Amino acid sequence: ATFSEAPPGNKDVGAKIFKTKCAQCHTVDLGAGHKQGPNLNGLFGRQSGTAASYSYSAANKNKAVIWSEDTLYEYLLNPKKYIPGTKMVFPGLKKPQDRADLIAYLKDSTQ
């Protein structure tokens, strides 16, 4: 399934998902430093493995994917399948609604 087939996302629900599943390793705050994972501010339209001053795996650099609703929707289903060798330990969000909600939050909070 693709993002175009996903249910509408709710950014408020997505914020809760981010807080419980992502915030341990990521921030979305402009100018904030990296945590265990890279700062996600400016994520949309950026190529994987290119946030300044973050030490990425070769897999993330070499994938060279441009982050969009479509690519994030697929990536967040199973990160290790989408980018074999990624350092991200998160197993993914299996429910389409959860992925749509998280993407709605990320679109709102990372620009």
Curated annotation (Swiss-Prot):
Positions bound to heme c: C22, C25, H26, M88
Q: Which residues carry this modification: N6,N6,N6-trimethyllysine?
A: K80, K94
Give GO MF terms, alphabetically. Answer: electron transfer activity; heme binding; metal ion binding
Q: Set out the biological process GO terms recorded for this chain's protein.
A: mitochondrial electron transport, cytochrome c to oxygen; mitochondrial electron transport, ubiquinol to cytochrome c
| Major location (coarse) | mitochondrion
Entry function: Electron carrier protein. The oxidized form of the cytochrome c heme group can accept an electron from the heme group of the cytochrome c1 subunit of cytochrome reductase. Cytochrome c then transfers this electron to the cytochrome oxidase complex, the final protein carrier in the mitochondrial electron-transport chain.
Question: What does the UniProt keyword field contain?
Answer: Acetylation, Electron transport, Heme, Iron, Metal-binding, Methylation, Mitochondrion, Respiratory chain, Transport
Q: Which Pfam families match?
A: Cytochrom_C
The protein's location, in the record's own words, is: Mitochondrion intermembrane space
Residues with N-acetylalanine modification: A1
What species is this protein from?
Spinacia oleracea (Spinach)
Q: Which family does the UniProt entry place this protein in? A: Belongs to the cytochrome c family.
Keyword Heme present in the record's keywords: the answer is yes
The SS bond pairs are none
Give GO cellular component annotations, separated by semicolons.
mitochondrial intermembrane space
Fill in the PTM field for this protein.
Binds 1 heme c group covalently per subunit.
Its recorded name reads Cytochrome c
